Each structure stands twice: as C-alpha cells, then as structure tokens.
Amino acid sequence: MIRYSIAAKEDLPRIVEIYNQSILTKQSTADVTPVTIEDKLAWFEAHDPKKRPLWIMQEAGVIIGWISLSDFYGRPAYDRTVEISIYIDETYQHRGIGQYAMDFVEKQLPGLGIETVLAFIFDSNQASQRLFEKNGYCLWGATA
C-alpha cells in the first residue's frame, strides 16, 4: 500500500536521487547533469504544504517517488493553476504507481483551491503522455 505525506527536508536526498535517475534517461527533465541536494534546496523550500505541496510516496517505509505541485508562470492570474511533476524510482515504474499518484492528487486539488493542472512532458516520454491522456488531460504544443 502506498502512503503519501508532505516531504520533509530529510527526504530531500532521496527526492534528488530519484530525480537524478530521470536525467540519465533524458525522458523527463531538461537537466543534463545530475543535481545536488544544494541545487534543489530553493525549489524544495518554495513548496508550501497548504498551497503548493511536495509529497513523497512510500511503500513499506521506502520512498518510491514524489509528487510536486509548483507555481505556473508566477503571475496572480495563475494562482489557481499548477504544474505537476511526478517522479517514480526506476525500480517501481510500470506498476501503475503513476495512476495512484494521479488519483491521490485529484482528490487533493479542491482543498488546495487548484482549478487547472498542467504538465510539461517530453515527446519521447510516451508512458507519461498516456497516463495524463488517460486521466483527461489534453496534449498542447506538440509539433508534427
């Protein structure tokens, strides 16, 4: 069973470890070299549990992934809009955990006052595209 909780500073090393796995695949992030805990500290601290949470996902006490809701575009008109990021440890991928994460987030949105969610997904990341499309998201900005 997956347990969700607000990320604490002591979770940051594992969050960074999972993030760095995605850099190697070139599927999920524009970073091209591994990041450090220090590199992600300001990003971590920008998350507010009441407005822009960062959750960890645990199974049997092990952090297997994380979910971030971040500001979009930084202008007041977008206060009810967030960018979602879901990162899952490579050994736990392709087990339906992304869908569990989507279901969890969907239930949290009303309490956070969020009306619009968007995700930046690389064209090569077909698994993420399918996950979001399956959950009613539309593809925008793709080129032929």
PLM regions and their residue ranges:
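A short beta-loop-alpha structural element at the N-terminal edge
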Residues: 3-15
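Conserved GNAT-fold acetyl-CoA-binding loop/helix
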Residues: 16, 20-43
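Conserved active-site tyrosine of GNAT-family acetyltransferases
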Residues: 19, 132, 137
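Acetyl-CoA-dependent GNAT
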Residues: 33-91, 102
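Active-site acidic-Proline motif in GNAT/NAT acetyltransferases
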Residues: 86-91, 95, 107, 123-124
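Conserved acetyl-CoA-binding loop-helix of GNAT-fold acetyltransferases
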Residues: 94-108, 129-134
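Conserved GNAT acetyl-CoA-binding A-motif
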Residues: 109-121, 129
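Conserved catalytic-core motifs of GNAT/GCN5-like acyltransferases
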Residues: 118-121, 138-144
